[in-house]
């Protein structure tokens, strides 16, 4: 049973509240806290000029602003501090303010604490956004008012009083959001786990432990969904306190969701045929299986099938940009890890011209070479990691005699131009970087949009 939001309203009134980060999720949060009568100070590395209208709007509402390089120096003397998701709880300034007696929390934690509706929480290394979107589409098709939040959708805490107990909430949750989560999800879904974000986590174990928080606080009334074919997530079963349901793309599961001979099943009943699913690739079959077993008690097989046969995917995920002179250009900018790029490559029915490389998250690229080479016709590399990726393909050539032609470029424009020159009629060109974007772009969406802009100008 979740807590009554009145408790939070009474608690926050007249409190001195620090909000770290004036980003997408925190702007509505700050406005909401003002409305609830809190005395708010907002902290951000950006300057007043960079924030523009946002800073003048907040100042007019009585928000104190601490901005610029040393913006966290004055994070002291607060009753409550809302941290930004990427901020580690063991960061010096948070440890200090906590010692002073401040209650340190986040928008997502407070939302889960007070939300009346049934919550589906989705995490994993790959497939989170697509699975979250599929689940929300199926719940909508069934007739539920559905709210989507977390990493995608809109910040929901500011809308908490509008959400009714009969509604459904679907949250995409990152390892950063889960690191401090100690509240139960009604349905927790873990799509898969592979090394990721090792630039932000101390090691792989810390990353796994963060993901586990999606189910560790559940009880017997809650449900955990695990991928039978992913060793790490299947291992979660032993620690689960609620019902565990499984999905598999490789074996029959009497009580789960599974794929066999071109058909997706739920508890032995056919839901749909793989060839009729609009978004291609076995990774999307797995996303659908996870969604089917997660929504088993809320959505009819008929509505599951309807969504699978009509939903055409999420932007920046194997997204067809255009076809020019018989060459198809795909934007898979979301692929910020080697496993994600591999899944994208396997979705195509031929070898492709791959544009890869970017910010270094300290991931190993050997799997991209060893498992990816049969799917790559030409490899175009750019960004911080281009030498690291080139080295693993050169090692493949030295050890197994398998040679992939590699071109190195400095910009995305050069990469697209090079790909266009290499391509012949019938070829596929895909931007699937296997890396984050931060060396050249603020995020994967801006990278993907830049790619689309370049392709559309060809």
Curated annotation (Swiss-Prot):
HAMAP family in the cross-refs: MurD (MF_00639)
Location in the cell: Cytoplasm
Gene Ontology process terms (BP): cell division; cell wall organization; peptidoglycan biosynthetic process; regulation of cell shape
Pathway membership: Cell wall biogenesis; peptidoglycan biosynthesis
Species in which this protein is naturally found: Clostridium botulinum (strain Eklund 17B / Type B)
Catalytic activity: UDP-N-acetyl-alpha-D-muramoyl-L-alanine + D-glutamate + ATP = UDP-N-acetyl-alpha-D-muramoyl-L-alanyl-D-glutamate + ADP + phosphate + H(+)
Primary residence: cytoplasm
Signal peptide bounds: none
Alphabetical list of Gene3D superfamilies matching this protein: Mur ligase, C-terminal domain (3.90.190.20), Mur-like, catalytic domain (3.40.1190.10), NAD(P)-binding Rossmann-like Domain (3.40.50.720)
EC category name: ligase
Residues holding ATP: 124-130
Any one of the GO CC terms: cytoplasm
EC number: 6.3.2.9
Protein name per UniProt: UDP-N-acetylmuramoylalanine--D-glutamate ligase
Keyword terms: ATP-binding, Cell cycle, Cell division, Cell shape, Cell wall biogenesis/degradation, Cytoplasm, Ligase, Nucleotide-binding, Peptidoglycan synthesis
Family: Belongs to the MurCDEF family.
Gene Ontology molecular function, alphabetical: ATP binding; UDP-N-acetylmuramoylalanine-D-glutamate ligase activity
Function: Cell wall formation. Catalyzes the addition of glutamate to the nucleotide precursor UDP-N-acetylmuramoyl-L-alanine (UMA).
């Amino acid at each position: 049973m979740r807590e009554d939001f009145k408790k939070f309203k009474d608690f926050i009134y007249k409190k001195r509240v620090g909000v770290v980060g004036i980003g997408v999720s925190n702007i509505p949060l700050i406005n909401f806290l003002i409305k609830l009568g809190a005395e708010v100070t907002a902290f951000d590395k950006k300057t007043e000029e960079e924030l523009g209208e946002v800073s003048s709007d907040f100042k007019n509402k009585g928000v104190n602003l601490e901005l610029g390089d040393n913006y966290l120096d004055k994070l002291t003397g607060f009753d409550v501090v809302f941290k930004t998701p990427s901020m580690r709880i063991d960061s010096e300034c948070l440890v200090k303010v906590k010692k002073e007696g401040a209650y340190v929390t986040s928008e997502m934690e407070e939302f889960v604490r007070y939300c009346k509706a049934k919550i589906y929480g989705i995490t994993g290394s790959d497939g989170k956004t697509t699975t979250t979107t599929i689940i929300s589409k199926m719940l909508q098709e069934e007739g539920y008012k559905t709210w989507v939040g977390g990493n995608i959708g809109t910040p929901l805490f500011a809308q908490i009083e509008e959400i009714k107990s009969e509604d459904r909430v679907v949250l995409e949750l990152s390892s950063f959001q889960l690191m401090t989560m100690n509240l139960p999800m009604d349905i927790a879904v873990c799509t898969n786990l592979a090394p990721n974000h090792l630039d932000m986590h101390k090691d792989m174990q810390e990353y796994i432990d963060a993901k586990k928080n999606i189910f560790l606080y559940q009880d017997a009334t809650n449900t955990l969904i695990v991928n039978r074919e992913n060793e790490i997530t299947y291992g979660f079963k032993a620690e689960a306190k609620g019902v565990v349901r499984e999905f598999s793309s490789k074996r029959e599961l009497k009580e789960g969701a599974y794929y066999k001979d071109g058909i997706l099943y739920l508890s032995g009943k056919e839901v749909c045929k793989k060839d009729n699913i609009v978004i291609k690739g076995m990774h999307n079959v797995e996303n659908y299986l996870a969604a089917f077993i997660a929504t088993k008690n809320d959505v009819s097989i008929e509505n599951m099938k309807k969504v699978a046969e009509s939903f055409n995917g999420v932007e920046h995920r194997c997204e067809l940009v255009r076809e020019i002179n018989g060459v198809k250009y795909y934007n898979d900018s979301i692929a910020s890890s080697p496993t994600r790029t591999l899944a994208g490559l396997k979705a195509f029915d031929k070898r492709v011209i791959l544009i890869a490389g970017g910010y270094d998250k300290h991931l190993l690229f050997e799997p991209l070479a060893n498992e990816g080479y049969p799917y790559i016709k030409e490899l175009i590399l750019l960004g911080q990691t281009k030498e690291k990726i080139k080295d693993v393909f050169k090692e493949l050539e030295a050890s197994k005699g398998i040679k992939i032609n590699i071109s190195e470029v400095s910009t995305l424009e050069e990469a697209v131009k090079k790909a266009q020159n290499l391509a012949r009629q019938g070829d596929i060109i895909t931007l699937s970087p296997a890396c984050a974007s931060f060396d050249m772009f603020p995020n994967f969406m801006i990278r993907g949009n830049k790619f689309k802009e370049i392709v559309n100008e060809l």
